[in-house]
């Protein structure tokens, strides 16, 4: 595997921050809404963001 440049690491770090925040927000919203279907959709969205977060983390060996 090739080494990542500092710019690439910075971009991945920014993406990790964004994905983590989106995951947390979607999970929080899924617990506060009263509509069951909307809650389920928000949970799925949170899961997708968590998967992307983990994939990005894997890029930097975390």
Regions found by a protein language model. Name each.
Residues 1-62:
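His/Met- and acidic-residue-enriched segments that coordinate or traffic transition-metal cofactors
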């Amino acid at each position: 595997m090739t080494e990542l440049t500092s710019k690439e690491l910075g971009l991945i770090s920014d993406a990790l921050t964004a994905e983590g925040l989106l995951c947390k927000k979607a999970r929080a919203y899924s617990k506060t809404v009263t509509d069951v279907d909307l809650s389920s959709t928000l949970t799925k969205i949170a899961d997708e963001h968590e998967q992307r977060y983990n994939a990005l983390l894997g890029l930097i060996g975390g």
